[in-house]
Every structure is written in C-alpha cells, then in structure tokens.
Amino acid sequence: MSEQPHRPPTTAPPTAPSAADRRAHMYGKAFAPEYQGELTTLSVNSSLTDVLTAGTAQLRAAERAGAPGEAARSGLAVAEAHRRLGQVAEADRAWKASYRAAREAGDTSAMAWALWSGGTLARQRGALPLARRLLRLAADSGERAGDVVVRGYSLAGLAETGRIQGDYEAVTALHEQLLAEARRRGEARHTVWALEGIAQIHRNTGSYDSAYAMFEEAAEIAAAAEDRRGHAWALRGLADIVSVRDGDTERALGLLAEAEASCRAMNLLGALAYNHKMRGNVLYRAGRYAESRELYTRALEEFDGMDEPRGRALARLGLVKSLARLGREPAETAADLDVLAETLDRIGLRHGRESVRRAREELGLTPTPPPAPAGNRTEESR
C-alpha cells in the first residue's frame, strides 16, 4: 500500500491581534480618582445618584467623627455628583466645604482636588476666567503635594477651557502633552479624554478624517476599559463626523442612541443634554427641521435646568435656525441671532460670533448694525 501524502494541519494559525486589540490592552480598567477615602469602592460607572447617596453618608460620618481629611475627600465625591447632575448651587457649596475641610486637615492634595472640582464647575457655568484661575491653583497645589493625578486633571481642565473658548493654538500642545503622559502611565480614562479633546480640535478646524480616527480610538479604549462615560462622549464625536462628513444620518442617530443608553444608565444629565443637542444637529443637516426643532427644544430645557449657559446658547442657536427653516419671520430670526451673538461673546466663546455669522449667511440674513454711540458716530452713520 502506498504511503499517504503528508497533509498540513487543518486548523488555521492564530490570528494576529488587531491594532484596536493591541491599543486596548495597553490600558487597565478605568478608575475614578475623584472617589477617594472610604469611597474608593465606587467605580467610574457608578450611578451618580448612588455616588451622591454614599458620599453624603460618608461625609456625615466623617463630620461626626471629627475627621476633616475624610470629610474633604467624601465631600469631593458629593460635589462632583451634584455638578454632573446639574445641581449647580449644591455643587458650589460642596466643593467649597471640601476645600475648607482639606485646609483644616492640612491636606494639600485634597485642597487641589477641591479646587479642581470648583474650576470644573465654573467652566460648566460659563464663568471661564474663574475656571482658569481655580484650575491653575489646583494644578499648582497638586504639584506641591506631589499628586500627579490631580495635577494632570487640572491641566486637562485648563486645556479643555481653552479649547471650548476656541483658543486652539494655545492648548493643542498641552492636549498632546497630557495624551503622551496618560499613554505612558496606561491611564485609560485620561487617554480617552485627551484623544477626544484633540479630535474635537481637528473636527472644528475641518480635519474630519483625523478627528474620526481619534474618536474611534477613544471609543475602543473606553469600551475595553469599561469607561461608559468616555465611551458615550466618543460615540457622540463619531456621530458628528459621520453626519457632517458622510451625510449618513441613520448611522449617526444609531451611535447617539447607543451613547444615550449609557448616559441614562449613569444619570449623566449634562452628557445627555449634549447628546440631544447633537441629535438636533444631525437632523438639521438632514433637512428634518421639525424633528430638529423638537430635539433642540428638549436640549434647551435640559440646559436651562442645570444652568449651563454654553449648552443653552448652542441649543438656542440650533432652535432659531430650525424655526427659520420652518417659516418663521426673518426679522424675528435676525433679532434672536443678534442676542445670541452677544451671549456667546459674553461667555467668552471666540468662535461664537462666527457661528452666528454663518447662520445669518445660511439663512440669507444680514446682521443688524449696532447703533453708534451719541457723539461718536462714524462718517457712514451720519
């Protein structure tokens, strides 16, 4: 009998890991450094209502025990939960109380974290000069305390404040520095934040392909690290690019629906409001103006409820444009755009007036010239 020919094994060789898999395995699970002391068992995905309940209970226990250090750290979690729930007055009281307790305990690191929380709240409220001042103090305090995490978070807050204002040249290098530091330490949550920030700068300056790639990487890292908040923001960024670059409305809406599920599970009211505003943007670009009007109206109500002036102004701009497309009187639209231009200037958003100018151009309106001050009129106004 002849010898059977040798056959290679039928099992396929192991597949090489994809670039996404390799990136994801560079990082550990996301953690929430703002949950400190006895609250370190809380996770980055803990519901904010659960954080508030646990934080308040621990704060009261620390106060009864006369432990200002623990009161400062549990108070930080309380402040952050209130802030993310849009409860501005409560958040303001909580971060200040946390700072006072940290100062009493002589804990410079806890003082830095309280300042970071206060600066982040100030940015959320549209008080950008105050945000910069508090975040700079937080970064300096963190450096003195040798706490690289709070220093990094505070510098990240400064970078985000500058980015929101449209000062891209000044903060791009800082974003990239923070991204490199986060990658080196394997910090998933901070890496995701930095990637999303740089991606947003690229998107706002028209570099859609690179923005998409960075939002995509951020989404992959966040998913692997179980960072639902970071993942939701990355999906929102991807939806924006898919809509504006590709015109793929249904895919964009699907990404936003996935992000909304995470926002609702964690009770992320601010992120949910921005999700609804983005859904309005997607529908507006698709010419579905009645639907975009409804989403902008919902987002506007949500921003009103949490005293978020930047989100409120941007949602209002979308609503004004939608109403104009649905037949509103041009004079009323023009008057609203004049008010919005002043509002965006007052908040300190450098790109705000340009957004209003583009809206006027898109809608075929001309700006209303401001009245010349008495005794100081130009030659043309005479």
Feature locations, PLM:
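Flexible inter-repeat linkers and adjacent short helices
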Residues: M1-G118, Q124-A127, L337-R382
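"A position-specific structural signal for the A-helix of alpha-solenoid helical repeats
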Residues: G37, E70, A77, A110, ...
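Structural motif corresponding to the intra-repeat A-B loop/turn of tetratricopeptide repeats
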Residues: N45, A65, L85, A105, ...
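Single-residue signature of alpha-solenoid repeat helices
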Residues: V51, A91, A131, V171, ...
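Amphipathic alpha-helical segments of tetratricopeptide repeats
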Residues: T56-R60, K96-D107, R136-D147, E176-G186, ...
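Residue register of alpha-helical TPR repeats
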Residues: R73, R93, W113, Y153, ...
